[in-house]
From Swiss-Prot:
Name of this chain's protein: MOXD1 homolog 2
Gene: olf413
Membrane protein topology class: Multi-pass membrane protein
Species per Swiss-Prot/TrEMBL record: Drosophila melanogaster
Gene3D superfamilies the UniProt entry points to: 2.60.120.230, Cellobiose dehydrogenase, cytochrome domain (2.60.40.1210), Copper type II, ascorbate-dependent monooxygenase, N-terminal domain (2.60.120.310)
Protein's GO biological process: dopamine catabolic process; norepinephrine biosynthetic process; octopamine biosynthetic process
Keywords: Disulfide bond, Glycoprotein, Membrane, Transmembrane, Transmembrane helix
Length: 760
């Protein structure tokens, strides 16, 4: 027993050191032990009640959240299934839903395209996310993705299928080892949102970032022309396996790629001008044009006289008319020109069936304003609500349609077959209900001429068509113009086009840029916001070519074997002082770039007189014999820094005053524009597994809201029926059940622990 310490002088109420121990009786000790045990049990019971009350509260919240999410998904499923029957889309219900959507003004999908008769892709872009939906006429696996050049190697793919009610979905890529089967990415950057199949179709909806920041396996979705890859097969992989070699016959499942622009497009639903009594429709067709044999080009001109448009109308849409599926392969461009004046040749041509454009002597000057322009791959163009192209017989009654025929992939086995006749053309829609602004077309670029030289065997050749500040300063209104759409054109070796804008000596962001252009798809792009251009701006069409596959030089011209560098812009308000704003390297620049000092006078063919080592050589021979491999740098520097001839024409066949005597030079830019690529950290998704379920309710609540489809946006038979699987609802139910069972097990274990403590 411890001894008490010696007392010190302290206040009576304060005691230092441990208190003195006193002896207790056994009965008192027993009573104290029982009291402590009862207190401990009471504390445990209170702890049990508090903890379990809190956990029961959490459990109720979990169940309520699960029921609410399941109800939302079930409602969405019922909307889809309610608009269709088991065999296809219910016409009455679909019409009702479409009418309701139209009445509410809510968008359905931004864009939709049929890649073939059995495969439709729909998409919507919200901020930096893009959501796709595949509707494919198959009960096997489907795939959709992107390729940098149309080849399988390096392709970025999303693959999925539905098997026994379970959706399988993976982010994949095609390796460069020659195997066409896409393999699963180590980083899963595509998120499944919905998957089902019915008696005929498989439907998958999924989301990804425009730029997933995974350049090793994914392709960023930009304003460039994308090469869309798609595939589908009648069978699913066995047992849902995603291991290499389990995808049935991928080489045959792939279909030919389609070049397409995904971002700068007019949104759906487009207006239906044919059902508007205020809209007039006019078909401008060629008449029995004999298509050229082989790969020979043909430029055909057909004049139309429109005399019955007695008051001002606005052109609001145009689209191609194909005479037959065979003629599609021949059509390259269709351009509708507005002709000024009443020349005798215009009236003469209006009475004719048409003629080759080279036989129209004064047409290029009389018909200098472009009304509409269509290129291969385009589905037409719809003007925005703020502008339309003005049409009125008192202003212009003659319209020239120029059609460029050129079959890039001719079947020479049919060379001696009977020539086909074509009656293709343009369908235009115009209305007397005028838009707020008159629209105009301005062509910017390199004038088609032999002085536009592209050397052979080079990966990157830069050409620039300059619209100089003298011409924009003269023609543009004081408040400037608003550019709302752009079409970029090259021919077969063009790879990149940019429309640059320079104000004084500062380069502004490019008006348009495509670093992956495709000759098979050159359409007008609707800019997200109109770009303002002021008088005195310099506009430059910069084109980059890859001539590494060519052994001889390529010259500028109109045929597909020659090259082009043109950017067509649609803008408002319209002005007539400037419709063509091109440039052309000056003859001294061309000669200097080839090491030529002087040409001989009055020589035919053209001969070189100096320097002495080239004297007597023809200009054509110099073009052929020039050492392009070792002297390309000097050539490129001379053409970009040398002088050029501005070509500025207005709608009424007038040259911009003073421009015919100007000699232009490249502008000294003191502040260049550089785009910085910024990749935000990726949101981690589930690692690749053999079964990838849709995201849980918490993730689904963050996905962009997509209104269900009307009859026009569901491929026939693709609607969900009563027999369709709905894995999103089932997966959510399974997830909620697992959480509920886990909570019950936890409560049971904690109760057993409490009973054990009470017994001890």
């Amino acid at each position: 027993m411890a001894h008490p310490r010696k007392a010190v002088a302290t206040p009576a109420t304060l005691q230092l050191g441990p208190p003195a121990q006193t002896a207790q009786s056994p009965a008192a000790t027993l009573r104290h032990s029982r009291t402590a045990s009862s207190s401990r049990r009471l504390s445990l019971i209170r702890c049990f009640i508090s903890c379990h009350t809190f956990n029961l509260f959490l459990l109720l919240l979990l169940l309520a959240s699960g029921v609410r999410a399941a109800s939302k998904l079930a409602t969405r499923s019922n909307k889809t299934s309610g608009s269709s029957t088991a065999s296809g889309v219910g016409a009455g219900t679909a019409a009702t839903s479409a009418a309701a959507a139209a009445a509410s003004g809510t968008p359905i999908w931004d864009h939709a395209i049929d890649l073939n008769d059995d495969f439709r892709i729909l998409w919507q872009i919200i901020n930096q996310d893009i959501t796709f939906e595949i509707q494919a006429r198959t009960l096997g696996y489907v795939g959709f993705g992107f390729s940098p050049d149309g080849n399988l190697a390096g392709a970025d793919m999303a693959i999925g299928w539905v098997d026994k009610g379970q959706t399988y979905f993976q982010d994949r890529h095609v390796t460069r080892n020659g195997d066409p089967e896409p393999v699963v990415d180590p980083s899963q950057d595509y998120m499944l949102m919905l998957g089902y199949e019915n008696a005929t179709h498989t439907v998958l909806r999924f989301r990804r970032k425009l730029d997933t920041c995974d350049p090793s396996h994914d392709i960023a979705i930009t304003n460039d022309t994308m090469r869309l890859l798609y595939m589908y097969h009648a069978q699913d992989p066995p047992h849902g396996s995603v291991r290499p070699g389990t995808l049935p016959d991928p080489a045959r499942a792939f279909r030919p790629y389609r070049p397409m622009v995904l971002m700068q497009r007019a949104q759906l639903p487009m207006p239906s001008p044919t059902h508007d009594e205020r809209v007039r429709v006019l078909e401008l067709r060629n008449e029995d044009v004999e298509l050229p044999a082989g790969d020979l080009p043909l430029f055909w001109c057909k004049m139309f006289k429109l005399e019955d448009i007695n008051r001002k109308h606005h052109l609001i849409r145009y689209e191609p008319i194909y005479d037959s599926s065979s003629s599609v392969h021949y059509l390259q461009h269709i351009t509708l020109h507005e002709c000024q004046g009443a020349h005798a040749e215009l009236e003469e041509m209006a009475r004719e069936q048409g003629r080759p454009c080279l036989g129209a002597r004064s047409i290029p000057l009389a018909c200098n304003a472009i009304v509409a322009s269509w290129s291969r791959g385009s589905e037409g163009f719809t003007y925005p609500h703020e502008a339309g192209y003005p049409i009125e017989s008192r202003q212009a009654k003659y319209y020239l349609m120029e059609t460029h025929y050129n079959n890039l992939k001719p079947d020479f086995a049919q060379l001696h077959a009977r020539q086909m006749a074509d009656n293709s053309g343009l369908k235009i829609y115009f209305t007397h209900v005028l838009r707020p602004n008159d629209a105009g077309t301005l062509s910017i670029g390199m004038d088609p001429n032999w002085r536009h030289i592209i050397p052979p065997g080079q990966k990157r050749v830069v050409s620039e068509g300059q619209c100089i500040e003298d011409c924009t300063g003269y023609a543009f209104p004081q408040q400037g113009i608003n550019i709302f759409a752009v079409m970029m054109r090259t021919h077969q070796i063009g790879k990149e086009v940019k429309l640059r804008q320079i104000r004084q000596t500062e380069e502004l962001p490019p008006i348009a840029h495509d670093s992956n252009i495709d000759v098979a798809y050159q359409d007008f792009r609707r800019l997200p916001q109109s770009v303002h251009s002021m008088p005195g701006d310099r506009l430059i069409a910069e084109c980059i070519y890859d001539s590494s596959s060519r052994k001889a030089i390529t010259l500028g011209g109109l045929t597909m074997k020659e090259e082009s560098c043109t950017v067509l812009t649609l803008y408002y308000p319209r002005q007539k002082k400037l419709t063509t704003c091109h440039s052309l390297p000056s003859l001294p620049t061309v000669l200097h770039s080839l090491g030529i000092e002087q040409l001989a006078t009055d020589s035919n063919p053209v001969l070189i007189s100096s320097p002495p080592e080239l004297a007597g050589m023809t200009l054509e021979a110099r073009l052929i014999s020039y050492d392009w491999e070792n002297q390309f740098g000097e050539f490129q520097e001379a053409t970009r820094k040398g002088s050029f001839k501005p070509i500025c024409w207005g709608a009424k066949n007038h040259v911009v005053p003073g421009s015919e005597f100007l000699e232009g030079y490249s502008i000294n830019v003191t502040k260049t524009y550089k785009k910085h690529r910024r990749c935000k950290p990726k949101r981690p998704l589930a690692p690749p597994t053999e079964r990838t379920a849709p995201p849980p309710a918490s993730d689904l609540s963050e996905l962009p809201v997509l209104h269900e489809l009307d009859n026009n946006n569901i491929i026939e038979g693709a609607a969900r029926s009563s027999r369709s699987s709905a894995t999103d609802v089932h997966s959510l139910s399974r997830g909620s059940g697992r959480h509920f069972i886990s909570c019950l097990l936890w409560l049971g274990a904690s109760s057993w622990w409490l009973l054990l403590m009470l017994r001890t």
